[in-house]
Structures are given as structure tokens and as C-alpha cells.
């Protein structure tokens, strides 16, 4: 049985959905971020692809996003590489990239894995703030019941592909 519902959709349409409608926060920022490309290049590339704006406008949007997620001195940090950021700061970069096109839905896959408790709390506060200040919904994929208790108003559990429950 074919379960790929995106089959038949054009690549341009799928790309538009992926950035403008749905965005993703990945579990491991170092796997997502390219270690040999500056943060500026990685952030502005997606902004320019979706918003059709100038390099300067994309750079200004990247600075705005970095401020929004709590990265200090964003103008100077744009020129840095991912390895120059802490784990928590890299996760903030991933969140900023996810917010770049004002998506309607953000899927966060284990967004606090491998972060210490203090940074984890900061990231959860940031996700809470984002959902309160924007029209975006957030789906959190996690095994951490502390994250669930902190953020979720609806819980969907799936211990196996056949057994599912909503509470």
C-alpha cells in the first residue's frame, strides 16, 4: 500500500509547505548545521529561498531571529561557525531557523536532548514563549515526561505502532 501522500505534489509546492507551513526543530543541532558554513549563510539561505528578499534583508531577519531566541550580540555571531557555539546556543539557532518563515506548525523532535537541566529549562521557556506569541502550533516528540509536563496540553502516546491513546 502506498502511504506517501506527498507523491504527485510538485517539488516547488512541497518546498513551500516545508518552510512556510511546517518547520522542524531537530534533536541534534550539530547533525543539522553544516560545520564548515557560517551561521549567517545557513540562516539566510532558507530565508531568501522562501521570502525572495535581498541578502541584506535576509541578514536583518537573521539578526532579528537570533535576538528573538536569546542569542547575545547576533550581528557578530552571524559570522561564526556552529562549533563556536555551545549546545544550547546551537539549539537556539535551529529554533531561529525553524521560525524564519513564520510557519503554522513546528515539529520539535526531542528539542532538549543532550542539554543540561538549566539550558533545557531555557529552551522549554523559549518554546512556550514562541507558541504564546505566534499563531504557530507545536508538536513535541519526546520520551521525557518532564518536557511533556512542562509544555503539553494534549498528550498523544504511541508505545507501539498499533497502540495509541490520547489524554
Across the structure, where does each feature detected by a protein language model lie?
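Conserved ABC ATPase signature
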Residues: 80-85, 89
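Conserved ABC ATPase "signature" region
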Residues: 57-76, 128
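Single conserved hydrophobic/aromatic residue that forms the stacking wall/gate
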Residues: 2-13, 156-167
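ABC ATPase NBD coupling module
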Residues: 1, 7-23, 41, 49
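P-loop NTP-binding/switch modules centered on Walker-like glycine-rich loops
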Residues: 115, 119-165
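Catalytic Walker B motif of ABC-type/P-loop ATPase nucleotide-binding domains
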Residues: 106-109
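A short, proline-enriched helix->beta-strand linker immediately N-terminal to the Walker B motif
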Residues: 100-104
Amino acid at each position: 500500500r502506498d502511504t506517501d501522500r506527498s507523491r504527485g505534489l510538485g517539488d516547488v509546492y512541497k518546498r513551500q509547505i516545508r518552510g512556510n507551513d511546517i518547520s522542524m526543530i531537530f534533536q541534534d543541532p550539530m547533525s543539522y548545521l553544516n560545520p564548515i558554513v557560517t551561521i549567517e549563510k545557513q540562516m539566510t539561505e532558507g530565508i531568501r529561498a522562501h521570502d525572495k528578499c535581498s541578502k541584506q534583508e535576509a541578514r536583518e531577519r537573521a539578526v532579528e531571529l537570533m535576538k528573538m531566541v536569546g542569542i547575545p550580540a547576533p550581528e557578530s555571531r552571524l559570522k561564526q561557525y556552529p562549533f563556536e557555539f555551545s549546545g544550547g546556543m546551537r539549539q537556539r539557532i535551529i529554533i531561529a531557523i525553524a521560525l524564519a518563515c513564520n510557519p503554522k506548525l513546528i515539529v520539535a523532535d526531542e528539542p532538549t536532548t543532550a542539554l543540561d537541566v538549566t539550558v533545557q529549562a531555557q529552551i522549554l521557556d523559549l518554546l512556550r514563549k514562541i507558541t504564546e506569541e505566534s499563531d504557530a502550533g507545536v508538536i513535541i516528540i519526546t520520551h521525557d515526561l518532564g518536557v511533556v509536563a512542562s509544555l503539553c496540553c494534549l498528550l498523544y502516546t504511541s508505545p507501539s505502532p498499533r497502540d495509541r491513546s490520547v489524554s
